[in-house]
């Protein structure tokens, strides 16, 4: 089980990313637009730098919904490989079965 502080930190980052998503996209659009002037671009870069660091989506970490484990998380299920295996062995995931060849 992951530390509760680490899970809470990721939840906080997700909330910040949602809050500043529109503003970040607007500034990024100005920066990448070839028609905008150099002054406008530079102003947008400076504004983007003033936003909270944790509002960037790339700072979020995929975590297991049950345990908070940060590694080996399968996106399709939102669970770590260990919990997916346990659920599959109990038959809780429809259509998923252990491979054999």
UniProtKB/Swiss-Prot annotation:
Keywords: Ribonucleoprotein, Ribosomal protein, RNA-binding, rRNA-binding. Signal peptide: none annotated. One of its GO terms (biological process) is translation. Pfam families: Ribosomal_S14. GO terms for cellular component: cytoplasm; small ribosomal subunit. InterPro entries: Ribosomal_uS14, Ribosomal_uS14_bac/plastid, Ribosomal_uS14_CS. One of its GO terms (molecular function) is rRNA binding. Binds 16S rRNA, required for the assembly of 30S particles and may also be responsible for determining the conformation of the 16S rRNA at the A site. Part of the 30S ribosomal subunit. Contacts proteins S3 and S10. Belongs to the universal ribosomal protein uS14 family. This is Small ribosomal subunit protein uS14. It comes from Actinobacillus pleuropneumoniae serotype 5b (strain L20). The lineage of its organism: Bacteria, Pseudomonadati, Pseudomonadota, Gammaproteobacteria, Pasteurellales. The gene is rpsN.
């Amino acid at each position: 089980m992951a530390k509760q502080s680490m899970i809470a930190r990721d939840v906080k980052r997700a909330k910040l990313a949602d809050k500043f998503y529109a503003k970040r996209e607007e500034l990024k659009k100005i920066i990448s637009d070839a028609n905008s002037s150099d002054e406008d671009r530079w102003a947008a870069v400076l504004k983007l730098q003033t936003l909270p660091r944790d509002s960037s989506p790339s700072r979020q970490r995929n975590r297991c919904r049950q345990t908070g484990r940060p590694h080996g998380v399968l996106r399709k299920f939102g669970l770590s490989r260990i919990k997916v295996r346990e659920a599959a062995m109990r038959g809780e995931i429809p259509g998923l079965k252990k491979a054999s060849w």
